[in-house]
């Protein structure tokens, strides 16, 4: 049988890379690469699980919470519970069907048999990596979680809806967490601009410079890079034959081998070449051993040190011969660099009293363990002192270049980091300055408002102190009006009408005060008491808010009292004249009924009630007028409403002021009349017989009220008498109150009581 090569040919790269030539990015079947677990955590995206992983919401077999947004969720549950669905569900996770256009039916059948065989399944289980069972979720009772995730087949529209809903929920959660319910602004004031946020944690995405020889580059590299490198090495190892492995290893380790070879070559060169003695050491050796210089420099007796005499002469004579300078300090410094040390002798130096002050007789002695008399071979050991870097070079460390480059890279990286931090700090400083400026502006505005409110409160307190006097403190402290029930501090309540059109009917807020006792004494009928301005419908609807409504609407009205207005001379009893006294005002008010009715009529018309309006229609109209909503804010805010026209506001204030002033005058008159009446009754009840004057009584009985002498009268010893009128004479009584003495002066007679008359 001859096979067709066009249909039976199969590209070997399909098994290696897992893709078809016509399939694009499609994955291969499990028969190609059975080791890779595509449903594991290795191929899952870690940063966007909410928007990309459908298995978190559409998998009923997983341990997570089912998706409530999926309309097919209930249908899925029913299908899973049915017995027929259990037979249809495959045991292994479904895999995409392989493109079999380049295979024959024989190959397909053979692959199907291999897939269904138990040996193949066992090989898959052995090649799979160990699966770590995650902890069970919080809201699921099942203790076991499935190994594979079966994705639910969903349409593109459903997936798009899921994405949109998840994005909306995520945005709402961010908005709620950002602001929350922490800030509440006043409705009348504009909201404050939010303070700017720091840019330190958000925008610090700076990636420092990384050089190729940076040692931290290998440390910062993640496990992903290591895994990628391992995969690449495996592929290269699989593609490279066994004979080329050694060459590959040699290529990888070529730099290190070259460095080691260069270091060993340096060591060999240094060891093989002849050692050269330093020129300075040889000059010192010849200088000390020359007999011509023994006057200035020579060996010590023990031969281990040499001494220098006459320093000034040594500088002028010896040093110029061997060196290009004549500086003794530089000569000593070079000796120290090559290992010589100064030996301090007790017999020399400043401790010697015979030495000159200039130090000419001072002997300088230097010692070196390798500089000994007649031991020239030890001069090879005298070397110049070297720094740590030079010692490292001599020791032959092969990684100096790498270390230097690494140190340079670290320095550059730290420099870039410092620059970035400085930029971030400057941005934060600018932000703090802006916030500080804004806070200062708000503080200035609040201070201005506080000053205006303080001036307003001062005016209110001064006004209350003038009106109420000493009782203003009780009102301000909130003791209520229970302490002002006495006659001198009568308080009434005044409720202003709601803001609106001036054509609306105004209900009477408070009837004029009436006293039944005072009305009966003056032959007047007491005025009927009016009901509360609140209608029955309002009372039924506002049972729970009665106290709050009365506290917000009813306000104490200013009263005129004797104490508050005692400063005016026209109202003072002590300084008033007989023509304009308060008694005459009370008398006219109590006697003139027309004036009283006129005042009451004016008051009722201003407030909104007509006298005698007791019909049902009027009551209905008043209740409807009263049922209008009244503002619950303060009086100052009521006058400053932005939607109220200016002319209506002024008219409303004018009407309220006129009605209040008329009611105040009326209440003031009622109060004064009541006080005067009570005082008169008290005086009449307190009259005693001890104050009764008989002479005055007899005088009133015998004389007329007229002050002029009538036509029938004549004077009798200075007394007025009438013709034919009887004169009551009592023992020791005087008819006239005035008696003329012998000198013609008038003397007042002494009053006599009833007891004195009875004694006579």
Curated annotation (Swiss-Prot):
Residues 19-31, 38-88, 515-539, 701-722, 731-742 have a biased composition (Polar residues). Keywords: Activator, Coiled coil, DNA-binding, Nucleus, Phosphoprotein, Stress response, Transcription, Transcription regulation, Virulence. Residues 646-684 form a coiled coil. Residues 414-467 are annotated as: Involved in trimerization. PROSITE patterns: HSF_DOMAIN. The modification Phosphothreonine is found at residues 574, 577. Pfam families: HSF_DNA-bind (PF00447). It is found in: Nucleus. One of its GO terms (cellular component) is nucleus. GO terms for molecular function: DNA-binding transcription factor activity; sequence-specific DNA binding. Residues 119-130, 744-760 have a biased composition (Basic and acidic residues). Residues 221-247, 613-628 have a biased composition (Low complexity). Changing residue 570 to E: Mimics phosphorylation and increases thermotolerance. Activated by phosphorylation of at least Ser-570, Thr-574, Ser-576 and Thr-577 in response to heat shock. Additional unidentified residues are also phosphorylated in response to heat shock. Changing residue 574 to A: Decreases thermotolerance. The modification Phosphoserine is found at residues 570, 576. Disruption phenotype: Leads to lethality. Changing residue 577 to E: Mimics phosphorylation and increases thermotolerance. InterPro entries: HSF_DNA-bd, WH-like_DNA-bd_sf, WH_DNA-bd_sf. Its main location: nucleus. GO terms for biological process: cellular response to heat; positive regulation of DNA-templated transcription; positive regulation of transcription by RNA polymerase II. Homotrimer. Homotrimerization increases the affinity of HSF1 to DNA. Interacts with HSP90. Belongs to the HSF family. This is Heat shock transcription factor. It comes from Candida albicans (strain SC5314 / ATCC MYA-2876) (Yeast). The lineage of its organism: Eukaryota, Fungi, Dikarya, Ascomycota, Saccharomycotina. The gene is CTA8.
């Amino acid at each position: 049988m001859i096979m067709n090569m066009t249909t039976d040919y199969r590209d070997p790269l399909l098994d290696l890379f897992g893709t078809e030539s016509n399939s694009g990015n499609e994955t291969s079947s499990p028969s190609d690469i059975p080791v890779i677990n595509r449903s594991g955590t290795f191929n899952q995206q870690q940063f966007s699980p909410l928007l990309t992983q459908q298995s978190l919401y559409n998998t009923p077999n997983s341990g997570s919470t089912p998706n409530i947004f999926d309309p097919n969720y209930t249908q899925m549950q029913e299908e899973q519970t049915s017995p027929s669905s259990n037979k249809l569900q495959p045991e292994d996770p479904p895999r995409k069907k392989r493109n079999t256009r380049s295979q024959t039916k024989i190959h397909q059948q053979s692959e199907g048999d291999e897939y269904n065989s138990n040996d193949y399944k066992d090989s898959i289980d052995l090649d799979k990596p160990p699966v770590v069972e995650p902890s069970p979720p919080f809201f699921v009772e099942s203790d076991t979680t499935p190994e594979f995730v079966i994705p639910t087949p969903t349409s593109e529209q459903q997936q798009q809806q899921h994405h949109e809903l998840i994005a909306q929920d995520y945005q709402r959660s961010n908005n709620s967490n950002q602001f929350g319910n922490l800030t509440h602004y006043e409705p009348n004031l504009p909201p404050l601009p939010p303070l700017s946020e720091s840019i330190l944690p958000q925008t610090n995405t700076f990636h420092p410079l990384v050089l190729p020889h940076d040692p931290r580059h290998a440390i910062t590299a993640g496990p992903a890079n290591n895994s990628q490198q391992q995969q690449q090495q495996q592929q290269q190892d699989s593609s490279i034959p066994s004979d080329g492995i050694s060459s590959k290893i040699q290529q990888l380790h070529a730099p290190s081998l070259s460095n080691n070879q260069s270091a060993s070559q340096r060591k060999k060169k240094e060891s093989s070449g002849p050692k050269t003695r330093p020129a300075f050491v040889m000059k010192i050796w010849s200088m000390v051993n020359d007999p011509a210089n023994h006057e200035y420099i020579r060996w010590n007796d023990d031969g281990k040190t040499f001494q220098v005499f006459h320093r000034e002469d040594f500088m002028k004579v010896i040093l110029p011969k061997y060196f290009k300078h004549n500086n003794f300090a530089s000569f000593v410094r070079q000796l120290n660099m090559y290992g010589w040390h100064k030996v301090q002798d007790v017999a020399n130096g400043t401790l010697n009293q015979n030495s000159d002050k200039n130090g000419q007789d001072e002997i300088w002695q230097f010692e070196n363990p390798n500089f000994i008399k007649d031991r020239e071979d030890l001069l090879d050991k005298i070397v110049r002192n070297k720094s740590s870097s030079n010692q490292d070079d001599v020791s032959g460390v092969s990684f100096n270049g790498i270390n230097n480059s690494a140190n340079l890279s670290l320095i550059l990286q730290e420099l870039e980091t410092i620059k970035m931090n400085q930029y971030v700090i400057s941005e934060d400083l600018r932000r703090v300055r802006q916030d500080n400026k804004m806070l200062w502006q708000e503080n200035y505005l609040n201070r201005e408002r506080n000053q205006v409110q303080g001036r307003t409160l001062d005016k209110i307190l001064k006004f209350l102190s003038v009106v109420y006097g000493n009782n203003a403190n009780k009102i301000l402290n909130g003791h209520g009006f229970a302490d002002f029930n006495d006659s001198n501090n009568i308080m009434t309540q005044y409720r202003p009408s709601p803001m609106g059109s001036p054509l609306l009917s105004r209900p009477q807020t408070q009837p004029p005060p009436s006293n039944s006792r005072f009305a009966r004494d003056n032959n007047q009928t007491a005025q009927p008491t009016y009901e509360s301005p609140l209608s029955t419908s309002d009372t039924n609807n506002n049972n729970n808010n009665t106290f709050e409504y009365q506290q917000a609407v009813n306000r104490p009205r200013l009263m005129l009292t004797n104490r508050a207005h005692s400063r005016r001379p026209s109202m003072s009893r002590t300084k008033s004249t007989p023509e304009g006294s308060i008694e005459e005002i009370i008398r006219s008010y109590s006697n003139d009924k027309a004036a009283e009715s006129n005042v009451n009529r004016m008051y009722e018309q201003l407030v909104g009630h007509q006298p005698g309006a007791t019909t049902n229609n009027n009551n209905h109209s008043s209740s409807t007028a009263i049922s209008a909503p009244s503002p619950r804010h303060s009086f100052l805010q009521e006058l400053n409403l932005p939607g109220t026209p200016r002319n209506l506001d002024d008219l409303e204030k004018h009407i309220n002021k006129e009605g209040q002033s008329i009611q105040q005058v009326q209440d003031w008159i009622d109060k004064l009349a009541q006080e005067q009446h009570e005082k008169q009754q008290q005086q009449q009840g307190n009259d005693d017989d001890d104050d009764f004057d008989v002479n005055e009584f007899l005088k009133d009985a015998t004389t007329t009220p007229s002050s002029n002498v009538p036509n029938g009268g004549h004077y009798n010893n200075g007394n007025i008498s009438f013709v034919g009128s009887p004169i009551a004479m009592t023992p020791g009584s005087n008819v006239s109150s005035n008696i003329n003495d012998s000198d013609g002066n008038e003397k007042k007679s002494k009053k006599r009581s009833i007891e004195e008359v009875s004694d006579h």
